[in-house]
């Protein structure tokens, strides 16, 4: 019988993490459970830095970006001895289960704790939208709005100077954020990691656009695919058009979460408590076709595949 739970946020922050913490805390308290907040993710868990949370601890948090519990990278958590200390800290505090909010690295930590016998529930909190078993992640829609706003602003200046602009978008090895932003921002070209990239093919497409009378263009590209400054130099050399690269960087992670992220985070946080009370552990929560779902966290990480939105790419190309 679960009486006390812990909650932490891990990895890169995402808008809506505070709303998810709030959802977990208030749903747990409504069911008569105690909640311990763990500072700075798995690092704080290892160092036994925790605080008891009540309803007022999460007041005025639903609209705040970031995570008030903090987050940290802690690669040492791969060590089984380190995880054993973490589990001992949880048991010492009387914590029966753990809710982890974060991306794929955070899920891996929850998976390893689960394999060591400690029940965990994972909530997908990342702007990258790269988590298996869910259509959307907490923070994705807010980041999408931020990226599209940046593209709109770049279009103003690009059109004024008849310039080609390259926009580097976060996403790690998933092109969802780039692709959605390219469609919503009316980008002329989009480059994502799911599709083989050739800079010469891109230049050929840009030249074809110029031949049709296009005066400026915006290229959206997912991070890690190439050096965007070098790409800009190459495009300018080959086309004769001034080309500049903009790396949006960590601004994409900040800001007050949009309503959908607040709703998604609240629903997922509450659902995590439902699952724990029903005796589930070692699960990850997702939303598919607007319905909350849960999957075995080990199976999700090791076996599930995340479909690429090929139809979205087809749409983007038709609208170039």
Swiss-Prot record:
BP GO terms, sorted: canonical glycolysis; fructose 1,6-bisphosphate metabolic process; fructose 6-phosphate metabolic process
Main localisation: cytoplasm
Enzyme class at the top of the EC tree: transferase
UniProt cross-references to InterPro entries, sorted A to Z: ATP_PFK, ATP_PFK_prok-type, PFKA_ATP_prok, Phosphofructokinase_CS, Phosphofructokinase_dom, PKF_sf
Keyword Magnesium carried by entry: yes
Keywords carried by this UniProt record: Allosteric enzyme, ATP-binding, Cytoplasm, Glycolysis, Kinase, Magnesium, Metal-binding, Nucleotide-binding, Transferase
Names of the cofactor(s): Mg(2+)
Binding-site residues for substrate, renumbered to this chain: 126-128, 163, 170-172, 223, 244, 250-253
Pathway: Carbohydrate degradation; glycolysis; D-glyceraldehyde 3-phosphate and glycerone phosphate from D-glucose: step 3/4
Residue sites binding ADP per the record: 22-26, 55-60, 155, 186-188, 212, 214-216
Annotated active site: 128
A Pfam match: PFK
Catalytic activity, as annotated: beta-D-fructose 6-phosphate + ATP = beta-D-fructose 1,6-bisphosphate + ADP + H(+)
EC id: 2.7.1.11
Sites where the protein binds ATP: 12, 73-74, 103-106
Homology family: Belongs to the phosphofructokinase type A (PFKA) family. ATP-dependent PFK group I subfamily. Prokaryotic clade 'B1' sub-subfamily.
Function comment: Catalyzes the phosphorylation of D-fructose 6-phosphate to fructose 1,6-bisphosphate by ATP, the first committing step of glycolysis.
Quaternary structure note: Homotetramer.
Protein's UniProt name: ATP-dependent 6-phosphofructokinase
Protein's organism: Citrobacter koseri (strain ATCC BAA-895 / CDC 4225-83 / SGSC4696)
Phylogenetic lineage: Bacteria, Pseudomonadati, Pseudomonadota, Gammaproteobacteria, Enterobacterales
Gene expressing this chain: pfkA
């Amino acid at each position: 019988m679960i009486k006390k739970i812990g909650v932490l946020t891990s990895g890169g922050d995402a808008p809506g993490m505070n709303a998810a913490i709030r959802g977990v805390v208030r749903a747990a308290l409504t069911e008569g459970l105690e909640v311990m907040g763990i500072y700075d993710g798995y690092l704080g868990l290892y160092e036994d830095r925790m605080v008891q949370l009540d309803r007022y601890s999460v007041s005025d948090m639903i609209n705040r970006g970031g995570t008030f519990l903090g987050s940290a990278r802690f690669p040492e958590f791969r060590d089984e001895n380190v995880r054993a200390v973490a589990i001992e800290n949880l048991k010492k505090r009387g914590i029966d289960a753990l809710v982890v909010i974060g991306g794929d690295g955070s899920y891996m930590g929850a998976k390893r704790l689960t394999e060591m016998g400690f029940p965990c529930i994972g909530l997908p909190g990342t702007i990258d939208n790269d988590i298996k078993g869910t259509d959307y992640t907490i923070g994705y829609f807010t980041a999408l709005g931020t990226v599209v706003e940046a593209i709109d602003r770049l279009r103003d200046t690009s059109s004024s100077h008849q310039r080609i602009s390259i926009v580097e978008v976060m996403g790690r090895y998933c092109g969802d954020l780039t692709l959605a932003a390219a469609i919503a921002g009316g980008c002329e070209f989009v480059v994502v990691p799911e599709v083989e990239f050739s800079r010469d093919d891109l230049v050929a497409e840009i030249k074809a656009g110029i031949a049709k009378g296009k005066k400026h263009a915006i290229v959206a590209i997912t991070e890690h695919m190439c050096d965007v400054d070098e790409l800009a130099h190459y495009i300018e050399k080959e086309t004769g058009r001034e080309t500049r690269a903009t790396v949006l960087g960590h601004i994409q992670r900040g800001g007050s979460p949009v309503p959908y992220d607040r709703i998604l985070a609240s629903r997922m946080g509450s659902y995590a408590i439902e699952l724990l009370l029903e005796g589930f552990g070692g699960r990850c929560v997702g939303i598919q076709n607007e319905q909350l779902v849960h999957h075995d966290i080990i199976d999700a990480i090791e076996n599930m595949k995340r479909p690429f939105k090929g139809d979205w790419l087809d749409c983007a190309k038709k609208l170039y």
